Amino acid sequence: MFIAINNTCHEQSTFSTYTSSGLVKNNLKESGFDYIKTKGFSKKRHMLSGNAVSKIKRNSLNKKVAVIGTGITGCTLSYMLAKKGIEVDLFEQSESICSGASSHELLVTYPRLSAHDSPFGRFNLQSYIYATNFYDNLETAAWKKTGVILLNHDESTQKRQSSLLEKRSDGEIYQYLNSDEASKISGIELKFNGLLYKDAGYILPNDLCRSLIDSPKINLFTSAEVKNISTMQDVTSFSVDEKIYEYEDVCLCTGSDTSKLLKIEGFNIKRGQVTHIETQDSILNINLPICAKGYISPQVNDLHIVGSSYSNEDHTKLTEEEHLSNLKNLKLIFDGDMVINSGKAGLRAVAKDHMPI
């Protein structure tokens, strides 16, 4: 462990310890650390402090990284790198950002949790908490922390929600709503009970991504289709319009296009189409996303987003079949007449077990 720590250090790395035991001192010395024994913290008599004996120079301030793709992943990664003082060259194959699966009018953010203590359940819970805190701290109007209601609409959902409520009843992550409570909170009459995820909501991806990459550390290249990625020793190169770019680190945030750039095992594409319906008096007051077999959003620019299909098709043309499927699923939430205005389709990158990539 001490060797692994030393391998991550540079010439200015320092450390301190709680303990000053012989075991720790011997391991520090053998693993390439210099130390001194000093007064301990609080009531502790002694502690150790020192530095790593390393010739590795700190170079992150002069580092430049290439990020390919300007969806939520690419823009968020660019933002995080820029916050660390790292310059980013951000490449987008289209004329404007968010041209792929992140191009939808809005994206609903909530977790798929498990009552069982599984890696999948823990990952989803921690991802959800991290994401909502991240969006909160951005203080951006592109994040709408409205809450999200998941309706208890069939036997499978009933079993899952009952298990979740048995596992956790403190209301911190989710809370039970009867149909009257769900109707009052959502702004529309609902016939099912369900769970409210109070810290969930939805994002406006285009606005969010523009705010994330608004930094002097981020250089945006649009209409820049990346080709011919190759790595030799510590340098990765690729071409854009026959010009060669070279970097120590290249990050592919390219979603369903990734398989065009690299050979990846177990990489699948799943199509998703959303339907934009015109608002009307009966749904005008919906003020948070409501999910059942499908979902409906609050109105954005006089439209509600209804989704989403999940098919094996590999194109992004709108189909009447998937529009009708979305509207059929919506009937569990709202069973009135709807007028289709438009829609949008994108391609998801998923593993064979449907986990997102």
PLM region spans:
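Short beta-strand to alpha-helix junction loop
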Residues: F15-S16, P119-S127, H153-T157, L195-S211, ...
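N-terminal Rossmann-like FAD-binding beta1-loop-alpha1 element of flavoenzymes
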Residues: N62-L90
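Central helical "cap/lid" subdomain
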Residues: C98, I244-I290, T316-E320, D335-M338
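C-terminal substrate-binding/active-site "lid" region of AdoMet-derived donor-dependent transferases
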Residues: F2-S49
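Dinucleotide-binding Rossmann-like beta1-alpha1 core, especially the glycine-rich loop
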Residues: L106-I185
